[in-house]
């Protein structure tokens, strides 16, 4: 019994010492809970991005934000009027601005009555009266019209098979085109006595002159130069805007060395350099015929005449109830 009392404490002490020894030499010894240096982190942990998912999303949103992105490249649009579609008015404004083709506005000086049954195809201001050529088969005519009242002073009707088109006066002769009949007429400008017929191979749309030659359109981007006596073709003008063809050239007027051309189915007039064929400006007549003046019977803008005394233009359209005297407003 005495021996047991002595050995038992020794065994307990030995056990404690053995436990301490084992714990102090064990490879799995417990260490304080501290972070390891970055150089000792696992390879997998070192390769993982040290960015939280939310931070990644935030970065992505920032990169894709329009405010953080560089400005988009400038896109240049070009107006091309072709047989399939015609650019809208707003498109003209946007694209002409991007191409640096000047856009002219207008100021209405006076408003005059216009025969709403006149399908205007050509318009001339001479000796204080209008000469007007009208279209539609069975309704085509050549007229003298009083500006202030809109009354018809003189009129001859074309044979029913002809669809009348543009007119011009050079000297004492008045020239009138027809649309698809490949036939034009020459009249005495005062009496409307027909002097001759003449053929041409294309459609007839608009006609004007530069004082020496006739200039004619056929609805394409080409203008034709004719000898006024023989009606032979002397040359062509290819009309382009920033290198692109301008189609549907219609009624023409020659003003200050430039050709003004209605572009069919638009409210715009192309101002054309006859030497190069380049469009030097666009006259935007959007809204010139107010909604209150529209009855639903009106057709497109067509008809340009020049008043040299006032340096103003007369503008109307097919079946329009009004005719406008305007002054162009060129942006500074």
Which residues does each predicted region cover?
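A short helix->beta-strand "capping" segment at the edge of beta-propeller domains
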Residues: 96-116, 147-151
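Surface loop/turn motifs at the tips and blade-to-blade linkers of beta-strand repeat domains
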Residues: 111-116, 156-160, 196-202, 238-244, ...
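Short coil/turn segments that connect the beta-strands within blades of beta-propeller domains
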Residues: 127-128, 171-172, 211-212, 256-257, ...
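Conserved beta-strand positions in repeat-built beta-propeller and related beta-rich domains
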Residues: 130-137, 174-181, 216-220, 261-265, ...
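Short loop/turn segments that connect beta-strands within beta-propeller blades
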Residues: 146-150, 188-192, 228-231, 273-277, ...
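Signature of short aromatic-glycine-proline-rich micro-motifs recurring in repeat-based ectodomains
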Residues: 120, 249, 296-305
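Intrinsically disordered, low-complexity Ser/Thr/Pro-rich tracts
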Residues: 1-6, 13-106, 332
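Beta-strand-rich domains and repeat architectures in extracellular enzymes and scaffolds
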Residues: 109-141, 156-168, 319
């Amino acid at each position: 019994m005495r021996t047991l009392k002595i050995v038992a404490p020794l065994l307990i002490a030995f056990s404690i010492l053995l436990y301490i020894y084992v714990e102090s030499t064990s490879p799995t010894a417990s260490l304080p809970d501290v972070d390891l240096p970055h150089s000792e982190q696992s390879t997998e942990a070192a390769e993982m991005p040290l960015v939280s998912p939310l931070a990644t999303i935030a970065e992505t949103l920032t990169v894709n934000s329009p405010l953080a992105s560089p400005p988009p490249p400038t896109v240049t649009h070009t107006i091309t009027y072709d047989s399939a579609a015609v650019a809208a008015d707003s498109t003209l404004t946007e694209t002409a601005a991007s191409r640096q083709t000047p856009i002219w506005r207008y100021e209405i000086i006076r408003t005059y009555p216009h025969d709403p049954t006149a399908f205007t195809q050509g318009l001339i201001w001479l000796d204080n009266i209008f000469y007007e050529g009208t279209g539609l088969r069975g309704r085509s005519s050549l007229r003298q019209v009083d500006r202030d009242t809109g009354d018809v002073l003189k009129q001859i009707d074309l044979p029913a098979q002809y669809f009348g088109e543009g007119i011009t006066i050079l000297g004492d002769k008045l020239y009138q085109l027809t649309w698809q009949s490949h036939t034009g007429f020459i009249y005495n400008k005062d009496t409307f006595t027909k002097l001759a017929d003449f053929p041409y191979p294309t459609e007839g749309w608009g006609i004007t002159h530069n004082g020496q030659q006739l200039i004619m359109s056929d609805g394409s981007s080409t203008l034709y130069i004719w000898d006024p006596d023989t009606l032979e073709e002397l040359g062509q003008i290819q009309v382009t805007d920033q290198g692109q063809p301008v189609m549907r050239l219609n009624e023409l007027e020659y003003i200050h060395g430039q050709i003004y051309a209605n572009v069919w189915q638009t409210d715009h007039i192309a101002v054309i350099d006859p030497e190069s064929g380049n469009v030097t400006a666009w006259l935007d007549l959007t809204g010139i015929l107010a909604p209150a003046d529209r009855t639903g019977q009106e057709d497109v803008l067509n008809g340009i005449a020049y008043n040299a005394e006032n340096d103003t233009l007369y503008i109307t359209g097919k079946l329009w109830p009004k005719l406008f005297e305007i002054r162009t407003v060129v942006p500074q």
